[in-house]
Amino acid sequence: MRFGHFDDARREYVIDTPRTPLPWINYLGSEDFFSLVSNTGGGYSFYRDARLRRLTRYRYNNSPLDMDGHRIYINDGGTIWNPGWQPAKTELDSYTCRHGLGYTILQGEKDGIAAAQELFVPRGDACEIDRLTLENKTAAPRTLDVFSYVEFCLWDAMDDSSNFQRNFSTGEVEVVEGVIYHKTEYRERRDHYAVFWANAPVTSFDTSRDAFCGVYGGPAAPEAVKAGHCSNSIAHGWAPVGAHHFHLTLAPGEKKSIIFGLGYIENPVGEKFSAPGIINKARAEAMMARYATDAQVDAARRALALSLIHI
């Protein structure tokens, strides 16, 4: 059975079905920050060391496979779907995954709404950029609830998957104007944190997995996505996550983009805090400012392409 083909002109492998024999994964990054992205948007991110500086969780032996990752959910009047099919597994009217050199693009369409999820790791920055472009291909206005979702790893991937007696009490986050800072152990013994942001105003958010997915729910059908909104939860221990919610209306033929970023920030020991108990966000704010517009993201994509032109 054929699952895809090479596009020689664009130097991409094009996957035509989400139901590949196993997840087909692209490896993004060439310096310090890396992301593994499958053909359905599964995977994880890390800084330098995949065990000791893991930003997001991934369960290798999970059933179903490849449920953890860089997730976008679209709730269109109660129909919930993902641009890359997983984890909701709602049948799409069309699907394509393009694995390129340093980037992956997931394209899905459902009931006249087209969604493209573009992921890459830019040169010179410790972050993953994830741009979502939505298009209303119908003749009527459409109102959507759109969600982003990642599940944070508590840094040491081995400890994170085994030392539950300790881990259930260490998770810590901070949210400022919709920007989610994962700062587990930052006060005690670490000088680094993760930041998960969007360049658009957030309607609601969640940082507790139980609040977003539901205690008896999961990534296939999160309770917040079904409800059409998050609950602005703040995680204290247990399983911290990052979830943004946007309530959008698209006019006929209109396109809108939202730029998400997942970054790693490390501060010198003497600069950990900007005030007592307040983490120093200066480097995070500078990073977010570098990817605030489509023009900036396009420029970062071009710079990445130029760096790989001789490969």
Where on the chain are the PLM-derived regions?
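Anionic coordination/interaction segments
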Residues: 1-308
